[in-house]
């Protein structure tokens, strides 16, 4: 029996950095856990977050998410969180070593792509290892996107 599954409410994207794929050449992605307080999780469950200007940094053998914005939870009292605090990312030692090595030696950048809840209801961050694109690379990407869109229109018109 084929059953149509509804979208799992626990597996939802909270915030997405759509500009990252345009500004960076994504070479590798990795899933990382986030160390969050209770009010941060509640704020995320309401779908409020912004990771547009955020990045990850390797400091002291740990990886930190910097400049991400999780607004304060409105129903919280005086124990609310700071919206732009640094958040620690949870990774294995091998994964951390691999990421720190690529950032140090090859001049790559750690860019967050999206924050979401997995099947167990845990907040996860999709982290990309990327190299910044130059202006001509961005123009080339734009040309390819426009051409594929135009090609689709032409094929649709012909039937």
From Swiss-Prot:
GO terms for cellular component: cytosol. GO terms for molecular function: RNA binding. It is found in: Cytoplasm. The keyword RNA-binding applies. The keyword Cytoplasm applies. InterPro entries: SmpB, SsrA-bd_prot, SsrA-bd_prot_CS. Keywords: Cytoplasm, RNA-binding. GO terms for biological process: trans-translation. Residues 137-159 are annotated as: Disordered. NCBIfam families: PRK05422.1, smpB. Belongs to the SmpB family. Required for rescue of stalled ribosomes mediated by trans-translation. Binds to transfer-messenger RNA (tmRNA), required for stable association of tmRNA with ribosomes. tmRNA and SmpB together mimic tRNA shape, replacing the anticodon stem-loop with SmpB. tmRNA is encoded by the ssrA gene; the 2 termini fold to resemble tRNA(Ala) and it encodes a 'tag peptide', a short internal open reading frame. During trans-translation Ala-aminoacylated tmRNA acts like a tRNA, entering the A-site of stalled ribosomes, displacing the stalled mRNA. HAMAP family: SmpB. This is SsrA-binding protein.
